[in-house]
């Protein structure tokens, strides 16, 4: 059985050392999970029992969001891939072991089309050239595919023919968006967009809800494990249908909308205005009427709610890797929800934030690591905190 398993696993990635994206390439998967468990235990076990990490059945080709940067090699050939770790040198990538296979096929096709259409790649040093990046998002359950072409100018020569040629090779593509990034910046996407084909977004299904995903929207990259993560978060909240819930850092409304069927009301807050637009549309599309979404800084929003004397029963918080800030957590403590469900992609900042919350009257009840990023050193963790009972 072990011999058969070894035969079906892909060969180790040939560019892993240069790319730097997968710190655990070459490490057996069970060993990766042990390393992550050990890391979470070391940081969080002082707050309570850390449950065994929930691993993946198949840790390959799981990323439904794929980004490629385009350049030319020394011979003038068009290459696509990723930036070498801590540099802006492009590492050509033919087959990434964690990125969606279909998306990688589309990127290879685009590389050929650039040559056929004589489109020049962008040169970061000189600022000349046109074609910078490609971003592809694929709906795991819907099968819908969005291709975002990132250019240094608003005009793609022969854009209609380019899109036709691309869709001839890949008729499964449901929308193509032109994103204009004409600044000297390390940011991938610019502010302006133009839809070349389709609706300009895709839809996907998660935990029974349908979600609209735009080029700039945050949506978890591992769809199978995301369902497990969110189901665990809802389970930890132990909602009865009577609770008022806040979904902080709500993105396109995923957690809030999934929780809405188990709660009295949900309020979501998110800084990214594009994500908030999607969240509002997602609520309408799912015919959910007990959810409201607001655009703004989560800390300031919570502060204002606390100042007005508003209270909530449950707080879901899913901050970025930097964790939450003290302003947000101080206002959260002031509002005093009975339960806080904290979803974290960085156990170090989670440990820091738990230290603050446990000093302010909360007790960690459950800690569950979830594998979301196989072959990398990253790990997601969901924690349940409850108000301490005063004797």
Residue ranges of predicted features:
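Solvent-exposed residues in well-ordered beta-strands and their adjoining turns
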Residues: 2, 69-73, 137, 150-152, ...
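Extended interfacial segments that mediate partner engagement and assembly in macromolecular machines
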Residues: 7, 23-121, 136, 141, ...
């Amino acid at each position: 059985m072990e011999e058969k398993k070894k035969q079906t696993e892909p060969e180790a990635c040939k560019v892993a050392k240069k790319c730097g994206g997968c710190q655990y390439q070459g490490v057996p998967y069970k060993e990766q999970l042990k390393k992550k468990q050990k890391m979470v235990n070391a940081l969080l076990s002082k707050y309570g029992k850390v449950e065994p990490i929930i691993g993946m059945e198949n840790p390959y080709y799981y990323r439904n969001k794929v980004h490629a940067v385009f350049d030319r090699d020394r011979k003038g050939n068009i290459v696509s891939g990723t930036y070498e770790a801590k540099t802006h040198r492009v590492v050509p990538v033919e087959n990434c072991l964690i990125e969606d296979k279909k998306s990688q096929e589309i990127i290879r096709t685009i590389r050929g089309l650039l040559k056929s259409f004589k489109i020049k790649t962008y040169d970061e040093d000189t600022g000349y050239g046109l074609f910078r990046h490609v971003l592809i998002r694929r709906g795991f359950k819907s099968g819908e595919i969005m291709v975002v072409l990132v250019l240094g100018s608003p005009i793609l020569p022969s854009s209609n023919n380019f899109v036709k040629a691309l869709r001839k090779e890949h008729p499964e593509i449901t929308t193509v968006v032109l994103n204009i990034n004409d600044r000297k910046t390390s940011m991938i996407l610019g502010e302006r967009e133009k839809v070349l084909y389709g609706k300009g977004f895709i839809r996907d299904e998660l935990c029974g809800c349908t979600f609209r995903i735009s080029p700039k929207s945050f949506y978890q990259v591992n769809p199978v494990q995301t369902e497990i993560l969110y189901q665990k978060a809802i389970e930890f909240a132990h909602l009865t249908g009577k609770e008022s819930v806040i979904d902080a850092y709500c993105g396109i409304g995923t957690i809030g909308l999934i929780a809405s069927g188990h709660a009295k009301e949900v309020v979501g807050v998110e800084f990214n205005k594009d994500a908030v637009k999607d969240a509002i549309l997602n609520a309408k599309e799912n015919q959910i009427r007990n959810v409201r979404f607001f655009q703004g800084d989560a800390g300031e929003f919570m502060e204002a709610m606390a100042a007005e004397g508003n209270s909530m029963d449950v707080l879901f918080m899913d901050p970025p890797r930097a964790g939450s800030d003290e302003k947000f957590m101080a206002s959260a403590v002031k509002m005093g929800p009975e339960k806080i469900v904290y979803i974290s992609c960085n156990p170090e900042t989670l440990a820091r934030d738990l230290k603050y919350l446990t000093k302010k009257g909360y007790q960690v009840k459950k800690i569950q690591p979830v594998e979301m990023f196989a072959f990398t050193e990253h790990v997601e963790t969901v924690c349940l905190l409850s108000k301490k009972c005063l004797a």
